Regions:
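Alpha-helical metal-binding/catalytic segments enriched in His/Glu/Asp
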Residues: 1-11, 71-73, 80, 87-103, ...
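Acidic-enriched catalytic cores of C-N bond-cleaving enzymes acting on peptides and small amides
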Residues: 61-66, 85-115, 134-210
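Short beta-strand-to-loop capping motifs
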Residues: 73, 131-135, 228-232
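Single conserved hydrophobic/aromatic residue that forms the stacking wall/gate
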Residues: 254-263
Length: 263
């Protein structure tokens, strides 16, 4: 006999599947049937792990004579971290961080605010940061961003033709993230892998293993939270890519949450 199980509310956290009681079904083999298109079924799925890290920071004073501005990444297509990860689209968190890292090495930069991405299973489309740099460097910063934007927009001209970098003046911020934490945060985002890690050796064109740097959020209590998700159709590779991300977090000496929702 064939048993059919229909669950609901899977996209928000597999709540239907997790509520399934042991022994409810009798079969030895489970075929997962899934699709976003009516009339089509996918047989099989990737397992996944969410890897989360949290920075605790101190607030420090922004020195007088510093100019505050907001740097934004906009116009990316984003997409599903499973179905679209192979398309090579830009990740707003990675691209913003790339410019912030460059800027922090060149100027006396204070990171006041950072925010990027939203859902754990979506490729980040937008991100922004509020930074403060010496007044004397504000014109040079705009030139730097123009040069940087031209280079990166050329890199993504085919897959993300609407990519934009925007620089806007911002009201003065009295406080910023302490320099040590800001440096470790930028280094962590830079080093954290994102994208396809391995392709299937059995099915041409099928992604086997991937990872998504989903979001960077400031939380109450002086917390900055980085959420990532790893997927693989092979259990050992899933654990391997999750360990890779976890190792990057450990090198930054930050708090790491236990992997959530492994499946």
């Amino acid at each position: 006999p064939i048993e059919c199980l229909f669950t609901v509310d899977e996209e928000t956290g597999l709540t239907g599947a997790f509520a399934l009681k042991e022994g409810f079904m009798n079969g030895d083999i489970l075929l997962n049937l899934d699709s976003e298109d009516e009339g089509e079924l996918f047989i099989g799925c990737a397992g996944g792990i969410d890897s989360v890290a949290e920075f605790t920071y101190r607030e420090v004073d922004v020195p007088t004579g510093h100019f505050c501005c907001k740097v934004q990444v906009k116009g990316l297509k984003g997409g599903h971290s499973g179905g679209d990860i192979h398309l090579g689209r830009g990740n707003a968190n990675k691209l913003l961080n790339r410019f912030l890292s460059q800027t922090s090495q060149k100027y006396d930069m204070y990171l006041c605010e950072i925010d990027g991405g939203n859902l754990r299973n979506a490729i980040a489309r937008e991100a922004y940061a509020v930074i403060a740099i010496p007044d004397a460097d504000k014109h040079a910063l705009r030139t730097d961003l123009n040069v940087f934007a031209a280079e990166v927009e050329a890199e993504y001209a085919v897959v993300d033709p609407d990519l934009q970098f925007v620089l806007e003046s911002e009201a003065a911020r009295p406080k910023a993230i302490d320099k040590d934490t800001a440096k470790r945060l930028l280094q962590t985002i830079y080093a954290a892998p994102h994208g396809v890690y391995a392709m299937s050796q059995d099915i041409p064109g099928l992604v086997e293993t991937s990872t998504n740097l989903a979001s960077v959020k400031m939380k109450p209590g002086h917390i900055i939270r980085i959420e990532t998700s790893q997927r693989s159709s092979t259990a050992s590779s899933k654990q391997d890519i999750a360990n890779m991300v976890r190792t990057v977090f450990e090198l930054s000496l930050i708090h790491i949450s236990e992997p959530t929702r492994p499946y």
